[in-house]
């Protein structure tokens, strides 16, 4: 499974670079090199004017676009298939292409898994508190709908309750009979993962817990599967952005960072193909978002450079750009080794 995990990580990098490659070709830009990995090229072949390579250090990848390096150095490239000759919108689209393909891959994984049937906890009550008891709910009740929205799995209950306002109308099945119950959610406050008493997470709850023995497979129509895929993608984005926010604000410890060892280790613990794909989809979203951060050497900083140059007409001198790029690479290497250190510390 470890080898499969490494291949999954390499595949996600391939997907990212394929995004840059595909959008560049659509925009009419020649791609000179498509490499998985950095450093010395271990093997390569040329096809349709592009050199495809596998390089020594498999911690990323890159595509080399015609005219991109010359533009960065302030030189002119006049041929039509040059990156330098493209419009600001096309440049932004090419730079965003990697993250876009990562996001698209995640959505497609979620879509096809939902379409093929998803193993879920059924919405059967295993335990309940006073609020639910007073509303007339009992252990073993199966929730069919909330406010006339059908419920297929227990995880759907929380999102429906969170969006609802006021009293809820629950349709339940008990002893082969369909009953209607009404209750008002309570606001529950808990301390966040940062253990800071001042940082509380508040959410609505109706006071029920699932019966962990009640599992089932839920199938979805094409539209439902697409809706489910977008919902899971949104959940992943919110979770990753919130984690980054807490890390930047200092409410999360840098000890929580994971490196390549931790990521591959987590992937290798997936005990089924669907679990591996789900983790891979989440990691793909992560890869896409991280590459959009405005850190020199990442796509986000290059996109910011295009905006400043073409909209605000601000261009930094080449030596400063090179210095920022080196600083960005240094920062990323530091983060990589910090994650690796955390991984090894956990193993020891």
From Swiss-Prot:
Record-listed E.C. numbers: 3.4.24.-
Q: CDD domains from the entry?
A: S2P-M50_PDZ_RseP-like
- UniProt-annotated binding residues for Zn(2+): 16, 20
**Topology class, membrane:** Multi-pass membrane protein
Q: Where in the cell is it found?
A: Cell inner membrane
Instruction: Provide the leader sequence positions.
Output: none
Identify the SUPFAM superfamilies for this entry.
PDZ domain-like
Pfam families registered for this protein in UniProt: Peptidase_M50
Q: Which UniProt keywords apply?
A: Cell inner membrane, Cell membrane, Hydrolase, Membrane, Metal-binding, Metalloprotease, Protease, Transmembrane, Transmembrane helix, Zinc
Specify the PDZ domain's residue ranges.
106-175
Question: Has keyword Oxidoreductase?
Answer: no
Its primary localisation, in coarse terms, equals membrane
User: In the UniProt entry, which residues are flagged as the active site?
Assistant: 17
- Cofactor(s) essential for the protein: Zn(2+)
Where does the chain cross the membrane?
Answer: 43-63, 93-113, 247-267, 275-295, 324-344
Entry GO CC: plasma membrane
Q: InterPro entries this protein is in?
A: PDZ_sf (IPR036034), Pept_M50_Zn (IPR004387), Peptidase_M50 (IPR008915)
State a single Gene Ontology molecular function. Answer: metal ion binding
Domain of life of the native organism:
Bacteria
The entry assigns this protein to a family as follows:
Belongs to the peptidase M50B family.
Name used for this protein in its record: Putative zinc metalloprotease HP_0258
